[in-house]
């Protein structure tokens, strides 16, 4: 999930969906809380059954939406970046990432985790391209919902959604956000700046934004 600090500074960068396992009797809040906890911990040794389940789900998504291909992770490089052993890198970065081929496509990314799937699409598209992007998202979600029993949570609508029934509402929110982000009058940036001021107080700026690394 996009963290709060990032959202405050930059605004949301993508429209996100989370496909979660909702057991009988669990509320949506319970499921979301468990999802956040799962993201914050090292889940321990790899479970072969879980790894096989993820591979099968990723394959089902590829079959439903053939434009997606798995990203091949270089665990040696990941271990170097994380300053850890390769075995630990494999354990911590155990998700399967699917991207559109050839890139960039619509920029949709699918991440298959142990007990959930995340689907994101950047705020790039309007009109026919936006419609097509959400059609692809529906294709991605179908096997996860029908074959694996996952429920779809839409943080933008703040509720569980059903596809394709909720696609028009989702696309309307998406295109409104695209319009706000690309507003030539800068209202989105002004609103983001005001939100930062409310959260942190006014912070004196000593460098231009592009000099942040100095």
Regions found by a protein language model. Give the residues of each.
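Acidic (Asp/Glu-rich) sequence patches and key acidic residues
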Residues: 7-214
């Amino acid at each position: 999930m996009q963290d709060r600090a990032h959202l405050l500074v930059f605004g949301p960068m993508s429209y996100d969906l989370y496909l979660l396992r909702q057991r009988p009797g669990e509320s949506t809040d319970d499921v979301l809380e468990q999802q956040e906890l799962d993201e914050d911990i090292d889940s321990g040794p790899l479970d072969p059954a879980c790894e096989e389940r993820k591979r099968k789900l990723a394959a089902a998504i590829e079959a439903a939406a053939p434009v997606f291909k798995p990203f091949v992770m270089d665990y040696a490089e990941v271990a170097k970046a994380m300053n850890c052993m390769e075995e630990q890198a494999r354990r911590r970065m155990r998700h399967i990432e699917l991207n559109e081929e050839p890139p960039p496509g619509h920029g949709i990314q699918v991440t298959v985790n142990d007990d959930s799937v995340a689907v994101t699409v950047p705020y790039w598209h309007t009109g026919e391209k936006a419609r097509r992007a959400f059609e692809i998202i529906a294709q991605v979600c179908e096997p996860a919902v029908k074959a694996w029993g996952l429920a779809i949570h839409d943080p933008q609508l703040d509720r569980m959604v059903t596809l394709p029934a909720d696609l028009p509402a989702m696309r309307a929110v998406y295109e409104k956000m695209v319009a706000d982000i690309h507003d030539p009058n800068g209202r989105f940036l002004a609103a983001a700046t005001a939100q930062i001021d409310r959260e942190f107080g006014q912070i004196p700026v000593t460098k231009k934004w592009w000099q942040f690394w100095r």
